[in-house]
């Protein structure tokens, strides 16, 4: 499937499938670099996977019984226990919101990553030919805007709890007097600490984006370079391996969030 007016070449196929449905592509904004150039497909599928997460957990919570649990309830309980154990082992403060935050991040990122296993043309083809939607990327976590938005959300919480727990003065002292506790080293300390602080959301968001984008490119290459009846030969082995990537990236994002929240709750004199 190629963009309108573009020859069905491997390069055109790849370019088409790496293009988001955006307000610029729909002619709603004049410039592609505009702040209001929104990736509609990424937002839709991130909301869609979020609703799936909420729907499953809400349904299980309503039907939870003290007797023999069903398979879905067992799966949900295992996930909750897994996340709770990691929070207990890693987070050393007292905040009842950290466990729900970690659970939400793990499940949401996992579901967004899981969209990478949907066959390349399964949704874009009918979207273009039946609904007239020219572009459609179904993996939200392969969009740097989504991953960086989540990372910046975690960063905002980190700053908020750092100031709340340590006080504005304590937070400032932590930046100015660490690692060298002398006033003459304040400029050097600030340089190190500010760069380290800003690197946290950048690495958090870019790590997830890089891994998922690379996985998506491999699937697209398999679809572009092979005839349709042989695509499974290239995609299946990668899909089996990619299941591990999907899980690991969701776990890493969750664990780093817990670690950052724990650092934010540490006393400034710790």
UniProtKB/Swiss-Prot annotation:
Primary localisation category: membrane
Lineage: Bacteria, Pseudomonadati, Pseudomonadota, Gammaproteobacteria, Vibrionales
Subunit structure, interactors included: F-type ATPases have 2 components, CF(1) - the catalytic core - and CF(0) - the membrane proton channel. CF(1) has five subunits: alpha(3), beta(3), gamma(1), delta(1), epsilon(1). CF(0) has three main subunits: a(1), b(2) and c(9-12). The alpha and beta chains form an alternating ring which encloses part of the gamma chain. CF(1) is attached to CF(0) by a central stalk formed by the gamma and epsilon chains, while a peripheral stalk is formed by the delta and b chains.
UniProt xrefs under PANTHER family: ATP SYNTHASE SUBUNIT A, CHLOROPLASTIC
Function: Key component of the proton channel; it plays a direct role in the translocation of protons across the membrane.
Annotated InterPro entries: ATP_syn_F0_a_bact/chloroplast, ATP_synth_F0_asu, ATP_synth_F0_asu_AS, F0_ATP_A_sf
Name of the protein in its database record: ATP synthase subunit a
UniProt-listed CDD domains: ATP-synt_Fo_a_6 (cd00310)
Membrane topology according to the record: Multi-pass membrane protein
Gene Ontology CC entries for this record: plasma membrane; proton-transporting ATP synthase complex
Source species: Vibrio vulnificus (strain YJ016)
Record's subcellular location: Cell inner membrane
GO BP annotations listed: proton motive force-driven plasma membrane ATP synthesis
Family: Belongs to the ATPase A chain family.
HAMAP family, A to Z: ATP_synth_a_bact
Membrane-traversing stretches: 40-60, 98-118, 143-163, 208-228, 239-259
């Amino acid at each position: 499937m190629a963009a309108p007016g573009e020859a069905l070449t491997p390069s055109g196929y790849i370019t088409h499938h790496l293009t988001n449905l955006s307000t610029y592509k729909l002619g709603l904004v004049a410039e592609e670099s505009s702040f209001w150039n929104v990736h509609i497909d990424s937002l839709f599928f991130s909301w869609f996977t979020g609703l799936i997460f909420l729907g499953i957990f809400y349904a299980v919570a309503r039907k939870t019984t003290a007797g023999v649990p069903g398979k879905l309830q067992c799966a949900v309980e295992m996930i909750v226990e897994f996340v709770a154990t990691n929070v207990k082992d890693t987070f050393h403060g007292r905040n009842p919101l950290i466990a729900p935050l970690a659970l939400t991040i793990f499940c949401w990122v996992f579901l967004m990553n899981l969209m990478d296993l949907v066959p390349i043309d399964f949704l874009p083809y009918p979207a273009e030919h039946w609904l007239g939607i020219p572009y459609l990327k179904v993996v939200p976590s392969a969009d740097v805007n989504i991953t960086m938005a989540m990372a910046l959300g975690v960063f905002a919480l980190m700053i908020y709890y750092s100031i709340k727990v340590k006080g504005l003065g304590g937070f400032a002292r932590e930046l100015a007097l660490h690692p060298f506790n002398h006033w003459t080293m304040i400029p050097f300390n600030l340089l190190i600490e500010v760069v380290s602080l800003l690197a946290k959301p950048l690495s958090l968001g870019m790590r997830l984006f890089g891994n998922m984008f690379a996985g998506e490119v491999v699937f697209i290459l398999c679809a572009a370079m092979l005839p349709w009846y042989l695509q499974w030969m290239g995609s299946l082995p990668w899909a089996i391996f990619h299941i591990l990537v999907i899980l690991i990236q969701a776990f890493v994002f969750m664990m780093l969030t817990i670690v950052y929240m724990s650092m934010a709750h540490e006393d400034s004199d710790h």
